[in-house]
Amino acid sequence: QNNLSFSSYTSVSSLRSKIDVLGAEDWVKARQLMASETGDLTFLDENFGAATDWQNEIFRTGVTQNYSVSASGGSKSSNYLFSLSYMDQEGVVINSGLDRITGRLNLRQNLLNDILILEANLTAANINNQWAPVGNGGGAGGDLIGNALRANPTMPVYNGNGDFFQPNTTTFNPVAMANLIDDRSQTDSFLANVAATFKLAKGLTNKTNV
């Protein structure tokens, strides 16, 4: 009897909550208050007129899609199982995620009136990861999330010509960091096992694996 099956599912993940930081209007008021007390008017050069929520810019709702197909069947003396699955997972940080393809093939054959049993199990996988520059992944630019929390909310994401806006400060444009720092990995794996089981006598067998 042969069987064919297919399954799929979709799920979403998102940030549970954001960290409270000053919005553009409150940031300007706070800098004005500081200036009235210190006389430091440099904040006027740092007010770029935008109202950017940097956490909204770098976080998203990540969608995960998974698809699987399998076929199995056989007879009294032989059987097989083949399966193939694909997963595409978006991270909750922009430009991060994982996609994975996995295939498996299992074969079994009984010979000589079940005195000899041959089995083969094969598994192959391809995994691609794209990492967001969080933690040390940000390199000299620092941590992406830390930059998003420190970033000036009056700073726009893009300048007038469509390039990423970057002022002359120690805080990097978080969206630029997420897009320009490319941290990827690819893993390919293949596992194979072949076994032969020989029934020497009732209750006595010898199995060899390769």
Regions found by a protein language model. Give the residues of each.
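Surface-exposed loop/interface segments of Gram-negative outer-membrane beta-barrel transport/assembly proteins
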Residues: N3-A51, V92-I94, T102-S189, K207-V210
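Short, P/G- and charge-enriched loop/turn segments at secondary-structure junctions
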Residues: W54-I58
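Fold-independent oxyanion-binding glycine-rich loops
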Residues: Y9, L84-S85
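Outer-membrane beta-barrel transmembrane strands
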Residues: R60-S78, S85-M87, P174-V210
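A conserved hydrophobic secondary-structure block that centers on an alpha-helix together
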Residues: K76-S77, V93, G97-L98, R104-L107, ...
